[in-house]
Amino acid sequence: MISLIAALAVDRVIGMENAMPWNLPADLAWFKRNTLNKPVVMGRHTWESIGRPLPGRKNIVISSKPGTDDRVQWVKSVDEAIAACGDEPEIMVIGGGRVYEQFLPKAQKLYLTHIDAEVEGDTHFPDYEPDDWESVFSEFHDADAQNSHSYCFEILERR
């Protein structure tokens, strides 16, 4: 199964200048909980923004340019990334925008954090047809001392 996991603000903004324009430790914990012990697939820009392999996960980076860091597996295409995951029950696609766009048609599940924030962004989550997805989990949280904005965790499964 292919799943996408993303945090998105109003207008589907997911990033600005290779970073997330908000501070939500709760979302980082949600991300870790849902990706741990699963292969994670990302584009080169996402890899560069993280700067290190995510522990407890097989890290696969899609890039047209050969990678030099042997702590991750470098592939050139979506199909190579899927093949690199072998028979893993769930592949977690973690970004960025172009990689989400390439995997969305193949995805069976979306793990989304909807952030109640209007922020400038240069990277967006792809537009998806809501009627194609069923919400199977939703959990709202108000902003607090640690989390800069209100947010809602949601899991969608393809109908």
From Swiss-Prot:
Start and end residues of each DHFR domain: 1-158
Keyword Oxidoreductase: yes
Entry superkingdom: Bacteria
UniProt-listed InterPro entries: DHFR, DHFR-like_dom_sf, DHFR_CS, DHFR_dom
Catalytic activity: (6S)-5,6,7,8-tetrahydrofolate + NADP(+) = 7,8-dihydrofolate + NADPH + H(+)
Pfam families for this protein: DHFR_1
Gene3D superfamilies, per database record: Dihydrofolate Reductase, subunit A
A GO biological process held by the record: tetrahydrofolate biosynthetic process
Keywords (A to Z) from UniProt: NADP, One-carbon metabolism, Oxidoreductase
GO MF term (any one): dihydrofolate reductase activity
Gene Ontology CC entries for this record: cytosol
UniProt EC number: 1.5.1.3
Name of the top EC class for this enzyme: oxidoreductase
CDD domains (alphabetical): DHFR
Binding site for substrate: 5, 27, 52, 57, 113
SUPFAM superfamilies with a match to the protein in the record: Dihydrofolate reductase-like (SSF53597)
Binding site for NADP(+): 7, 13-19, 45-46, 63-64, 76, 95-102
Role description: Key enzyme in folate metabolism. Catalyzes an essential reaction for de novo glycine and purine synthesis, and for DNA precursor synthesis.
Protein family according to the UniProt entry: Belongs to the dihydrofolate reductase family.
Protein name: Dihydrofolate reductase
Organism: Citrobacter freundii
Phylogenetic lineage: Bacteria, Pseudomonadati, Pseudomonadota, Gammaproteobacteria, Enterobacterales
